[in-house]
């Protein structure tokens, strides 16, 4: 089976070759005639990190950030912010809280694609803070000592809601994001192979899938009310065309699960008529797994298996169908049927 390879947001970017002979002195002022271009200046940053000088690397990254701001280079701005957060975590305590403050400040002054990327990254940092400090929240209710600027005083509901809100905000500008190719941001995305790029061709694909990855985590729903939306319509196991065209009632209770389904619909519509179905198949597989794990329909296992079999037949001539075959063959219900026929 062809290994799935997608581009992942680089919170800690991979360091390049070290240039040990270069020092921070040439970086102090990008306008003093010493500016060497982004590639060489980042080599200086990498060199300083390699020499175990995170404080100097931080200052060097800050210099690039200032230059990128003047240059209005969104890609380099985000890359510099990522490195600033990285080196801040090396030289200061409470690194996640510091990183959150850094990203929040940037969100307030940013716009367009760069703002969406920062919102998605900040959401991930919030969620990582929760998972790393889950034990702190186990018995904590809403506290009278709550401070909006101090995440360590938050309760689990507040933290979950903040994470959710940021992921939602990151894809709010979906039409603009759909127009921007992920290849434009190769400096801040870990580049996958050609197949991986087919799965995430636009920044909307990239950010929407990140939001879905969050919404597919069962732990996200522990603070939801008992009257939350339930997935009880078999259309979630239907063909991509049937699912994409289904209209969920406006009277449905707004919930995280309903939002997830609507994101799946939007991604499906975006790729329904692609010349190559790799991105569509990827969305279909993800949607079917989400449906199987979240629906209250009694015969969900058979609906899931039948959906996989239908999908496999539909895309039998495409290499991506091997992923569907693997899932259907590993389906417990199919294994039971095989045993009964023996």
PLM regions and their residue ranges:
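Extracytoplasmic/secretory-pathway proteins
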Residues: 34-342
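Bacterial Sec-dependent N-terminal signal peptides
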Residues: 1-38
């Amino acid at each position: 089976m062809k290994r799935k390879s997608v581009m992942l947001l680089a919170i800690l970017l991979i360091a390049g070759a070290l240039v040990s002979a270069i020092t921070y002195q040439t970086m102090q002022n990008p306008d003093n005639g010493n500016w060497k271009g982004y590639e060489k200046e980042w080599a200086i940053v990498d060199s300083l990190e390699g020499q175990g000088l995170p404080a100097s690397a931080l200052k060097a990254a800050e210099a690039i950030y200032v230059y990128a701001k003047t240059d209005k280079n969104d890609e380099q701005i985000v890359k510099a912010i990522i490195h600033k957060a990285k080196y801040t975590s090396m030289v200061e305590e409470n690194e996640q809280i510091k990183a959150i403050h850094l990203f929040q400040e940037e969100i307030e002054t940013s716009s367009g694609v760069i703002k969406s990327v920062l919102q998605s990254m900040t959401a991930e940092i919030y969620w990582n803070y929760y998972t790393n400090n889950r034990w702190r929240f186990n018995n904590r209710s809403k506290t009278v000592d709550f401070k909006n600027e101090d995440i360590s005083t938050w309760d689990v509901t507040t933290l979950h809601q903040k994470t959710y809100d940021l992921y939602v905000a990151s894809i709010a500008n979906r039409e603009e994001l759909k127009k921007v190719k992920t290849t434009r941001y190769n400096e801040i995305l870990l580049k996958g192979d050609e197949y991986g790029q087919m799965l995430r061709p636009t920044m909307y694909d990239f950010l929407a899938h990140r939001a879905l990855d969050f919404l597919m985590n069962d732990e996200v729903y522990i603070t939801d009310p008992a009257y939350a939306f339930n997935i009880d319509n078999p259309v979630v196991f239907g063909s991509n065309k049937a699912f994409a065209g289904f209209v969920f009632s406006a009277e449905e209770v707004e919930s995280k699960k309903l939002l997830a389904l609507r994101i799946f619909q939007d991604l499906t519509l975006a790729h329904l008529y692609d010349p190559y179905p790799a991105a569509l198949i990827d969305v279909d597989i993800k949607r079917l797994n989400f449906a199987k794990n979240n629906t209250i329909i009694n015969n969900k296992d058979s609906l899931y298996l039948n959906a996989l079999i239908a999908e496999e037949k539909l895309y039998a001539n495409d290499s991506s169908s091997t992923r569907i075959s693997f899932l259907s063959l590993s389906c417990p219900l199919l294994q039971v049927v095989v045993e009964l026929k023996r």
